[in-house]
Amino acid sequence: MQIKSFLLAAAAAPAALGAAVNTIKPFNCGTDAPSRQHIQMTKELAEKEAAMAAEGIMTAQATINVNVYFHVVAASTALSDGYVTSTMINNQVATLNKAYAPHNIQFTLKGTDYTINSNWAVDGSELAMKKALRKGTYKDLNLYILKDLGDALGYCYFPTSVTSKSNDWYYDGCSILYDTLPGGSLTNYNLGHTSTHEIGHWFGLYHTFQGGCSGNGDYVSDTPAQASASSGCPTGRDSCPSQPGLDPIHNYMDYSYDTCYEEFTSGQRTRMTSYWNQYRANASV
């Protein structure tokens, strides 16, 4: 069974009527812990990466090209019901490309479809929705833009071994709260970086605060240890003072404000490439 990764809002804002209005949702991390199986996969990839680096055989990675299918699932054709515009979608793709380009990852919008379904729009009947809407192969990214995810801003699934048309194959992809797209109404989280963050999980990354101050953390050697998720943009935060480095508050895999996000690390780039090559690059179904 795959693992769903959540960004949780601590308080729900009242639903807007008519045109969308600015809302504020402070949020906490509610991510399910990676399974033992997935952690073992990550450990094995980390060991391979370290061995290759020690032998000096790390090679330049060709650009990873990801086809993206947007599925806008709304309760009506009103923006406040999740019916985002094509401009918001195009701006979201541009945001992703700006964030991932330094790591040789490129996203191409391959298609957008709109569905009016009040149940699916609030994350009801997830598997049925995805069986009806999913497109492409396991190397193609499906983004489901929904009106409401309960307390969540978004969730995604880690890469793993799947067979075509299995439930795990259908579940793959990310569900994103509509007003986190660029131009959305969610204060502090409306520049499109909820998607940037969630797609990091789609590439196999954990949160920077995975594991806290002890152990292997997120299994990436160049992300400083972090006791818990950040809130806002707390410059100088050092939640693991006995460990090297300040908290990586600007890292896309923390939970900072969108305006605070700036980077993935070199180690995260290597990990995304490893997971891509292992599970997605050669997918034909």
Swiss-Prot record:
Does this entry carry the keyword Transferase? no
Instruction: Please name every pair of cysteines joined by a disulfide bond in this record.
Output: 233-260
What is one GO biological process annotated to this record?
A: proteolysis
InterPro entries assigned to the protein according to its UniProt record, in alphabetical order: MetalloPept_cat_dom_sf, Peptidase_M43
Residue positions with a glycan: 282
Query: What is annotated as the active site?
Result: 198
Where Zn(2+) binds, per the record, is at 197, 201
The GO terms this record gives for MF are: metal ion binding; metallopeptidase activity
User: What keywords are assigned to this protein?
Assistant: Disulfide bond, Glycoprotein, Hydrolase, Metal-binding, Metalloprotease, Protease, Secreted, Signal, Zinc
Please tell me whether the keyword Cell inner membrane is annotated for this protein.
no
**Signal peptide positions (record):** 1-18
Q: Which compartments does it reside in?
A: Secreted
Q: Recorded E.C. number(s)?
A: 3.4.24.-
The terms describing its cellular component in GO are: extracellular region
The protein's superkingdom reads: Eukaryota
PANTHER family assigned to the protein according to its UniProt record, in alphabetical order: METALLOPROTEASE MEP1 (AFU_ORTHOLOGUE AFUA_1G07730)-RELATED, PTHR47466
* Family stated for the protein in its record: Belongs to the peptidase M43B family.
Primary role: Secreted metalloproteinase that allows assimilation of proteinaceous substrates.
Name under which the protein is recorded: Extracellular metalloprotease NCU07200
Which source organism? Neurospora crassa (strain ATCC 24698 / 74-OR23-1A / CBS 708.71 / DSM 1257 / FGSC 987)
